[in-house]
Design a protein with these regions (language model features):
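Phenylalanine-focused residue identity feature
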Residues: 8, 28-29, 37-40, 81, ...
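N-terminal "domain-start" segment
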Residues: 1-75
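Generic detector of intrinsically disordered, low-complexity, polar/charged segments
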Residues: 56, 63, 79, 104-107, ...
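Generic structural motif recognizing short loop/turn segments at the entrances and edges of beta-strands
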Residues: 15-21, 36, 83-88, 115, ...
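Short, mixed-charge low-complexity intrinsically disordered segments
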Residues: 71-88
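Acidic, proline/glycine-rich low-complexity IDRs
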Residues: 86-135
Length: 135
């Protein structure tokens, strides 16, 4: 299992690549990573429900916002972290009550528009992928 320093280093390496495709990556350590996510981004509306996706990382990533955006990110994720134990995805389009809190001037991960949020659960930590744009 990775310690926090190793996890941050690998997550930073993955984030560098992912940001080229307008995707940010953040590691979370709490068992209840959704609460940690809400606290980290100061989201007050907590009614959003995560929708489970397919078990396949490549398939889940491709389903979110198109293969072009995710192919290289999926490969790098697998090489750095291996396959996750579980993947949870939700689309902001399906959760309009969260759009105002996740997007806009103080938007989530620096994106003005946020499209999808995905959590890849591993043993002892969770990677959060946020797909968005400033255009």
């Amino acid at each position: 299992m990775l310690d926090k320093e190793q996890l941050f280093d690998k997550a930073e390496e993955l984030d560098e690549l992912a940001m080229r495709y307008e995707v940010s990556v953040s590691p979370f350590f709490e068992k209840d990573y959704l609460t940690e996510f809400y606290n980290f981004y100061e989201i007050r509306n907590r009614k959003a429900k995560l929708i489970p996706s397919e078990e396949d990382l490549d398939g889940s990533l491709r389903d979110l916002s198109g293969e072009y955006r995710w192919k290289e990110i999926a490969e790098k994720t697998k090489s750095l972290f291996g396959l996750p134990e579980r993947i949870m995805v939700f689309s902001i389009d399906d959760l309009p009550h969260l759009k105002d809190e996740l997007g806009g001037r103080r938007g989530c991960s620096g994106f003005f528009f946020v499209f999808d949020v995905m959590f890849c659960e591993y043993d002892g930590y969770t990677l959060c992928f946020i797909c968005g744009t400033n255009n």
